[in-house]
Amino acid sequence: VMPDTDILVIKGVGTRPLYDANPEDPTAPRDGVISFPAGQWNSQQTYVIANSESGMLLDGADTPPDVGEGSEFALAVAWPYRLQIYYIRDGATPTLSRKILAWDAETESMSIQTEDLVQGVENMRFRFGYDSNDDGEVDTLAYLDDITAWNQVTSLQVFLLLASDVVDPSYMNEKTYQLGDIAVDKEYLELYGRPVNLRRILLHSDMTLRNPRLVLRGSG
């Protein structure tokens, strides 16, 4: 990983869960086996199997737990699990890369795999907007190390610094690139051993995050 760059870990689930039986049909027979819709269980996928009280990660090649009434995972639902880790991979040419949880055909198991996305990305910085007083509006901007309540994060600013892979001996980059709270200038580049005579461009994007609040209530 390139020093002094951010790493973003995204964990989530798919939008099409699997059930013991059709949840819209109260008369459908239930046997405690996750099998609806039929034929959708994928042995090359990881699932989050959870009800309101218990949850677990399970590879699809393994045997899922009993979800029948009276079991630990009674009426649990299986959600396809997603894991993505974005970072700048160090090297002669820095690269925006990501690690994902995916099926490995060679080992016939789930594993963390690396994908290179964009070459020439030297730095990546994230600034988050969050609603600290629960009034529905972003009121605070903060960086990764300063976020304490991730369920309140509702927006994201992304800064990417890209560099050419061709050194121009006649060009000396004297610019300062502001990636949020980090100023990348000639001294910064020299500190991390990056060529100064590369042409660079700073990209910035704002996005809204879907971050619903989940509240679980039990009967008294």
What are these regions (language model features)?
Residues 207-209:
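C-terminal functional modules
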